[in-house]
Regions:
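Extreme N-terminal segment that seeds HTH/winged-HTH DNA-binding domains in transcriptional regulators
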Residues: 1-29
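Conserved functional loop/turn residues at catalytic and ligand-binding sites
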Residues: 48
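Minor-groove-contacting beta-hairpin "wing" of winged helix-turn-helix DNA-binding domains
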Residues: 51-62
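Mid-protein regulatory/catalytic core that forms ligand/cofactor-binding pockets
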Residues: 65-170
């Protein structure tokens, strides 16, 4: 298999996948190193393919649902509650965004669609002793969401407001 054929096969795998695929799994499948897969992904992106790196692996972002952005504010301890509220309302948490004073906007892909996804994300945060990216901004952050409808987004905003997590600049 040539490198170009491998890249095409990797893209086909990602397109067909319902969940993210790790670079390690792709490396095993194609009998190459993880670094080769990372390079292949970079080349596929350079060709114009939309490939997202999530904490669970690579994926092709689904273009379903309404894209909405919501501003939130809470402590790191409340991250799981916030994310559960979002997925329980039927939304996919696409990413988290913070505004850094030097780097500007920092965006981290999440792709969380279920309680299981959230639990896995929180587990990785705890076992790696990592702080949420919102720790850089005192808990203020944005989420890009994919929502099934405007009604669901409105319900989520009301839910987060009741939880005291919806950011209000006042």
């Amino acid at each position: 298999m040539t490198a170009a054929q491998r890249r095409s096969a990797i893209y086909d795998q990602l397109t067909a996948a319902q969940t993210p695929i790790s670079a390690t799994a792709l490396a095993r499948q194609f009998s190459v190193t993880r670094q080769v897969v990372v390079g292949d992904i970079a080349l596929l992106r350079a060709e114009g393919h939309s490939i997202t790196a999530t904490p669970r692996g690579y994926m092709i972002p689904a273009e379903t649902g309404l894209r909405r952005t919501i501003a939130c504010h809470h402590s790191g301890e409340d991250t799981q509650k916030e994310l559960f509220a979002m997925v329980d309302c039927g939304c996919t948490v696409v990413d988290v965004i913070v505004e850094h004073p030097v780097y500007g906007q920092l965006t981290a892909p999440l792709a969380l669609s279920s309680r299981y996804d959230v639990e896995q994300f929180i587990h990785r945060m705890k076992t790696s002793h990592a702080q949420p990216i919102s720790a850089l901004t005192g808990g203020v952050h944005l989420h890009t969401l994919s929502c099934p409808s405007e009604a669901v987004f409105a319900h989520l905003k009301a839910t987060l407001a009741n939880m005291g997590m919806l950011y209000d600049a006042d």
